A protein has these predicted regions:
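Central antiparallel beta-sheet cores of small beta-barrel/beta-sandwich binding domains
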Residues: 21-101, 109-138
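Bacterial Sec-dependent N-terminal signal peptides
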Residues: 1-24
Length: 138
């Protein structure tokens, strides 16, 4: 009987440790730019707003930007993830590098020419190419 309790406790601890040490399943916000990034790079588990018909995906970039940008592919390299984002029309893509800088902060750097934009008045303007992201509380 005690052995069964031990293994149940061990499974619970390992499960918690896996989620606590998982830097690639999270929700981030840049409070200054009001941009959010929600990702799960371990499985396609996130419903992307306005793209529900495609089923769960690995994540999206949204908030104070024009449209929603879905994570269409990614590569994890040590402490960085290279994300490929596609807009909700499928007409533009943006590569971005996500780097963990501390337990609760990340930097999202848009690579190449920035195509992610925000509407200001009647015009579209490119967002800043480097976003300081803070991990949202689960």
């Amino acid at each position: 009987m005690h052995l069964r309790h031990f293994f149940a406790f061990l499974a619970l601890v390992l499960c918690h440790h896996t989620h606590a040490g998982n830097p690639w399943k999270l929700s981030l916000t840049d409070p200054k730019e009001k941009v959010t990034l929600t990702i799960d790079l371990h499985e396609e588990s996130i419903e992307v707003p306005e793209m529900e018909m495609f089923g769960p995906m690995n994540g999206y970039l949204g908030g104070n930007i024009y449209g929603v940008w879905a994570v269409t592919s990614f590569k994890i390299k040590k402490d960085k993830a290279i994300l490929r984002l596609s807009n909700d029309l499928g007409s533009e893509t943006q590569e971005a590098e996500l780097t963990q800088t501390s337990d609760s902060t990340y930097t999202l750097k848009l690579l190449g020419s920035t195509v992610v934009k925000r509407a200001e008045g009647r015009k579209l303007h490119k967002i800043t190419s480097t976003l300081k992201m803070i991990r949202n509380q689960d």
